[in-house]
Amino acid sequence: QTNVSLKSLINDQFSIDDLQITTKEIKLNDIIALVGIFQNSPQLFILDTFVRDGFVTANINLNFDEKGNIKENYKIEGAVKKAKLNILNQFKLQNLNFNFNINKSSHSLKRLDMMLNNIKITSPSIEIEKNKNSFFVNGQFLQGKKNFNIEELKLIFDNLFNNIDIQKIEFSSKNNFSFNVNKKFKFDN
């Protein structure tokens, strides 16, 4: 959907004031390839190597100036569903689902849930604020109750449980986090 200025049409100027795009479900890899055509970057290449599967839907609102340039008040809202990522063969994210809101200065991820190396993790919200030379990331991870057999933990904690008569342990966690990351994805803080 778009609005066209009659005055601009008559004066033979760029005539689109705003543009609203609503997508159907699109494969994440197809979106990454499409964005790569217009804005190729090392970060996009890295993302493409991590993403194995998944879908995105989006509502995109763009406003244009008289010259046809996109104004900085754009808004992108949508959802990622059933995403799978393999990060350096160490971290396997499966069934990654979240809603997102993106504008010039911030990115917001809501109702995130995923399996990370077969452990279910959720997050009510992760906020990413764009600063001059970095991004400030702030959020919370929740891990629901997880039962561990003592034999599974012995592999990690070695001899810690040898003299204790415990068969199973139940864990749950709530972790708040925040950090700065620069534009080359190096942690500053």
Give the label of every model feature segment:
Residues 113-114, 127:
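A short beta-strand motif that forms part of the nucleic acid-binding face
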Residues 10, 129-131:
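Short, ordered beta-strand-loop transition motifs
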Residues 1-9, 96, 107, 112:
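N-terminal beta-strand/beta-hairpin edge segment
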Residues 14-86, 105, 132-189:
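Extended amphipathic, helix-rich lipid-handling scaffolds
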Residues 2-4, 55-61, 95-97, 120-123, ...:
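Short small/polar-residue motifs
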Residues 1-2, 13, 87-92, 116-120:
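Solvent-exposed loop/turn segments connecting transmembrane beta-strands
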Residues 2-7, 28-33, 118-126, 147-151:
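A short, polar/proline- and glycine-enriched secondary-structure boundary/capping micro-motif
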